[in-house]
Amino acid sequence: MTATFLMSLLFGLAFGQTMSLCVPTGYTMHIERRECAYCLTINTTICAGYCMTRDSNGKLFLPKSALSQDVCTYRDVIYRTVVMPGCPPHVIPYISYPVAVSCRCGKCNTDYIDCIHESVTTNYCTKPQKPYLVGFPV
């Protein structure tokens, strides 16, 4: 191996974990309404990644505020609204969904963020799909 490659590898291993890997990441979600005929497939962005955190061994001697860990959370969010296709006239067809513009590592604010990852949640359609691209149904 060359010295340059070896130095690059060592540099990456040493400093790679210190950089924030909390970034907006592409995510596909499926939205259904019981009253509407179709399922809507939407591509958006969510905050995902890793944040540096420390887990202290002396938890009994620290205040509770020192025990909370940083999570990858939203810095800036915009909401987009789309029309759900195939809804009857008495149903409001508008759906708003979040789009992560920027992310940060910080404390999880449970007032507006779900801080728990539920692995049993499904993300699929049970009805025929209508993809949604750049604000226009296809």
UniProtKB/Swiss-Prot annotation:
SUPFAM superfamilies assigned to the protein according to its UniProt record, in alphabetical order: Cystine-knot cytokines
A Pfam family assignment: Cys_knot
UniProt keyword terms in alphabetical order: Disulfide bond, Glycoprotein, Hormone, Secreted, Signal
GO terms (BP aspect) = G protein-coupled receptor signaling pathway
Domain of life, source organism:
Eukaryota
| Similarity comment: family membership | Belongs to the glycoprotein hormones subunit beta family.
Check the record and name the PANTHER family matching this protein: GLYCOPROTEIN HORMONE BETA CHAIN, THYROTROPIN SUBUNIT BETA
Q: Write down what this protein is called.
A: Thyrotropin subunit beta
The protein's organism comes out as: Monodelphis domestica
**Name of the gene encoding the protein in the UniProt record:** TSHB
